């Protein structure tokens, strides 16, 4: 796959294209693109800062550094903490942002997505809670790290 294929045309950002892919449902990419662009436009109107910069800030806040993987050792299953690769971390962050945006009350997905990105960039919201929960699980199971 070429670089051109994974970069959003109007925003010139790979992160925006990845967000569009995560919002995408039932192959309706133009609808997903419209939702993401409207959400980024709302963020720009709200705080006079680039929506793409706010999205990057939100993803860096939500991106997990460690996660737990189930590992079977001698009949017992342990939750073993592991470092998260950068690409996986970005995907998890975007997945969580979209999931918790969907769970918000409200009518328009663009409004809910804009609110979740805004909250994530400022260290609040459901996606941040999910990251903290993941880190707590890894910390609690640190004793099993040698099972990697």
From Swiss-Prot:
The membrane-spanning stretches of this chain are none
Q: Which GO terms describe its molecular function?
A: rRNA binding; structural constituent of ribosome
What does the UniProt keyword field contain?
Answer: Chloroplast, Plastid, Ribonucleoprotein, Ribosomal protein, RNA-binding, rRNA-binding
Organism superkingdom: Eukaryota
- What is any one GO biological process for this UniProt entry? translation
Q: Name one GO cellular component term.
A: small ribosomal subunit
Q: Where in the cell is it found?
A: Plastid, Chloroplast
What is stated as this protein's family in its record? Belongs to the universal ribosomal protein uS7 family.
Tell me the NCBIfam families matching this sequence: rpsG_bact (TIGR01029)
Task: Give the protein's function.
Answer: One of the primary rRNA binding proteins, it binds directly to 16S rRNA where it nucleates assembly of the head domain of the 30S subunit.
- Summary of subunit composition and partner proteins: Part of the 30S ribosomal subunit.
Task: Report what the protein is called.
Answer: Small ribosomal subunit protein uS7c
């Amino acid at each position: 796959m070429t670089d051109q294929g994974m970069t959003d045309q109007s925003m010139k950002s790979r992160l925006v294209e990845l967000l569009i892919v995560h919002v995408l449902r039932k192959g309706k990419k133009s609808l997903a693109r419209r939702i993401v662009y409207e959400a980024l436009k709302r963020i720009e109107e709200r705080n006079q800062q680039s929506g793409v910069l706010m999205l990057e800030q939100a993803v860096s806040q939500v991106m997990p550094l460690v996660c737990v993987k189930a590992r079977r050792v001698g009949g017992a299953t342990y939750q073993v903490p592991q470092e998260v690769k950068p690409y996986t971390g970005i995907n998890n962050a975007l997945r969580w942002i979209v999931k918790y945006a969907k769970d918000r009350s409200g009518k328009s997905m663009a409004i809910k997505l804009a609110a979740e990105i805004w909250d994530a960039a400022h260290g609040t919201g459901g996606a941040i809670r999910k990251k903290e929960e993941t880190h707590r699980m890894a910390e609690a199971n640190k004793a099993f790290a040698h099972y990697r």
